[in-house]
Design a protein with these regions (language model features):
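Conserved helicase RecA-like core
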Residues: 1-382
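Arginine-glycine-rich low-complexity intrinsically disordered regions
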Residues: 117, 380-418
Length: 418
């Protein structure tokens, strides 16, 4: 049967009341498919992109079942463990769980790197219902015996493919091995490379498979375009795009941490206020940058792929790929930052001649050719070369020149965001 209302799940009263207060009535597709089996005790293998409502899909069943338990967790234990690849995503998950709980007697603890261990150790010493953690810091605290996982009956691995990309799979396997053998597990991933499939096989028992966005599927309401520009011309082209009134809230993606800093510095020189966010930034600096972006004090955020996981900001008008990603799947994650909650959005890719192979990988994954964009003149013969197969090649130096002048320039919410 198709689920059309959260009321059909029979969730605990505090959860239902919190959803009603927030105006959340209709589950997203992944919530409609995943919540009921988990309430029945089944494991879940979820294939879904970011922004589809995954947090509620695994969070509501855990909260519902914990509320039915008597007593409190024992010291240095937790009842549920949620692993996330990045600090930003972990913070976002905890925030959503608190909202869903609606003031019910649920305790949570964030276990993250980049901040003091002492406060985390004190909180864990009392015992908590739900630990939301990144693998590195959690491995340290478990190894130092500040937390036992053998009483955790629920475990969630969110964005498992990104954990693989970040080299966390070994730590994740070790942590999973310390969990209670009779546990309920869920694994969510946007893609399913062999290593993640192997992890799912060892973690899950006869799981229900739910799939919302098949691999390579992108959101139709996002306008996607590509501009072939020389590397040296990217700075001017980016400034020109950001000078348009339509570019009201923008995420610019750079491939490396150093590259993100360089882009933000160049934008500042061009009179455009921007903040950079990446893994080398301290947690409080990352939080300040995100707060400034959410509040509108800063309208341009420059990010790396890993740091962008967990950015939960509505109203993104543009995503700009200053650099093409090394992995085509990251393109799908990037552009998914815009076009959320029924709104439209634009995704613009600036492609240098030496990035053509990465562009072809993106087009193969998404099964579509990106439309040529930009208002600069572009010779008609350049387009076939631009999309040519590797053996055909493309003329060196082809592509548009930015017509942006030099000098300084002044440049309805739904539950699916959970």
């Amino acid at each position: 049967l198709t689920i059309t209302s959260f009321a059909e799940f029979g969730l605990a009263a505090p959860l239902t009341a919190a959803l009603e207060r927030a105006g959340f009535h209709t589950p997203t597709p992944i919530q409609a498919q995943a919540i009921r089996p988990q309430l029945e005790g089944r494991d879940i293998l979820g294939l879904a992109q970011t922004g589809t409502g995954k947090t509620a899909a695994f969070g509501l069943p855990i909260l519902h079942q914990i509320l039915a338990l008597p007593g409190r967790p024992a010291p240095k234990t937790c009842r549920a463990l949620i692993l996330a690849p990045t600090r930003e995503l972990a913070v976002q998950i905890e925030d959503h769980l608190r909202r869903f709980a609606g003031g019910a007697r649920i305790t949570t603890a964030l276990v993250l790197g980049g901040v003091s261990r002492n406060a985390q150790i004190r909180q864990l010493s009392r015992g908590v219902d739900i630990v939301i953690a990144t693998p590195g810091r959690l491995t340290d605290l478990v190894g130092d015996r500040h937390l036992r996982l053998d009483e955790a009956r629920w475990v969630v691995l969110d964005e498992a493919d990104r954990m693989l990309d970040m080299g966390f799979i070994r730590e994740v396997r070790k942590l999973v091995g310390a969990l209670h053998p009779r546990r309920q597990s869920a694994l969510f991933s946007a893609t399913m490379p062999p290593e993640v499939a192997g992890l799912a096989e060892s973690l899950l028992s006869n799981p229900v498979r739910v799939e919302v966005a098949p691999r390579g599927e992108t959101i139709d309401r996002i306008g996607q375009s590509v501009e072939l520009v020389a590397t040296a011309e990217k700075r001017g082209r980016l400034a020109a795009i950001l000078s348009t009134p339509e570019a009201s809230r923008v995420i610019v993606f750079a491939r490396t941490k150093r590259g993100a800093d360089r882009v933000a510095e160049n934008l500042a020189k061009d009179g455009i206020v921007a903040e950079a966010i990446h893994g080398n930034k301290a947690q409080n600096a990352r939080n300040r940058a995100l707060d400034a972006f959410r509040s509108g004090r800063v309208r341009v955020l420059v990010a790396t792929d890993i740091a962008a996981r967990g950015i939960d900001v509505t109203g993104i008008s543009h995503v700009i790929n200053y650099d093409l990603p090394d992995e085509a799947e990251s393109y799908v994650h990037r552009i998914g930052r815009t076009g959320r909650n029924g709104a439209g959005g634009q995704a613009i890719t600036l492609c240098a001649p030496d990035e053509r192979q990465k562009l072809r990988a993106v087009e193969k994954l998404t099964r579509q050719r990106l439309a040529p964009g930009g208002d600069a003149p572009r010779p008609a013969q350049r387009e076939p070369a631009f999309h040519a197969e590797a053996g055909e090649g493309a003329k060196r130096g082809g592509g548009p020149r930015s017509n942006a002048p030099g000098g300084r320039r002044r440049r309805a919410r739904r539950f699916a965001a959970a």
